[in-house]
Amino acid sequence: MADTTGRIPLWVIGTVAGIPVIGLIGIFFYGSYSGLGSSL
C-alpha cells in the first residue's frame, strides 16, 4: 500500500503538471497574439 502511494508514476506527475502549464502557455501566446501581451 505504501509502495503504490509513495511511488507515483512520472507520467501521472507529468500529465497533472503539464495540463495547467500548457493552459498558461496557451493563454500567454493568445494574449500576446491578440495584443494584450505586448503591454506587459
Curated annotation (Swiss-Prot):
Keyword flag Thylakoid: yes
Transmembrane regions: 8-28
GO (cellular component) term, any one: chloroplast thylakoid membrane
Pfam families per the UniProt record, alphabetical: PsbJ (PF01788)
Localization of this protein: Plastid, Chloroplast thylakoid membrane
Main location: plastid
Gene Ontology BP annotations: photosynthesis
Keyword Nucleus: no
Intrachain S-S bonds: none
Keywords noted in UniProt: Chloroplast, Membrane, Photosynthesis, Photosystem II, Plastid, Reaction center, Thylakoid, Transmembrane, Transmembrane helix
Membrane topology: Single-pass membrane protein
SUPFAM superfamilies found in the cross-reference section: Photosystem II reaction center protein J, PsbJ (SSF161021)
Family membership: Belongs to the PsbJ family.
Subunit comment: PSII is composed of 1 copy each of membrane proteins PsbA, PsbB, PsbC, PsbD, PsbE, PsbF, PsbH, PsbI, PsbJ, PsbK, PsbL, PsbM, PsbT, PsbX, PsbY, PsbZ, Psb30/Ycf12, at least 3 peripheral proteins of the oxygen-evolving complex and a large number of cofactors. It forms dimeric complexes.
Function text: One of the components of the core complex of photosystem II (PSII). PSII is a light-driven water:plastoquinone oxidoreductase that uses light energy to abstract electrons from H(2)O, generating O(2) and a proton gradient subsequently used for ATP formation. It consists of a core antenna complex that captures photons, and an electron transfer chain that converts photonic excitation into a charge separation.
Matches recorded under PANTHER family: PHOTOSYSTEM II REACTION CENTER PROTEIN J
Full protein name: Photosystem II reaction center protein J
Species lineage: Eukaryota, Viridiplantae, Streptophyta, Embryophyta, Tracheophyta
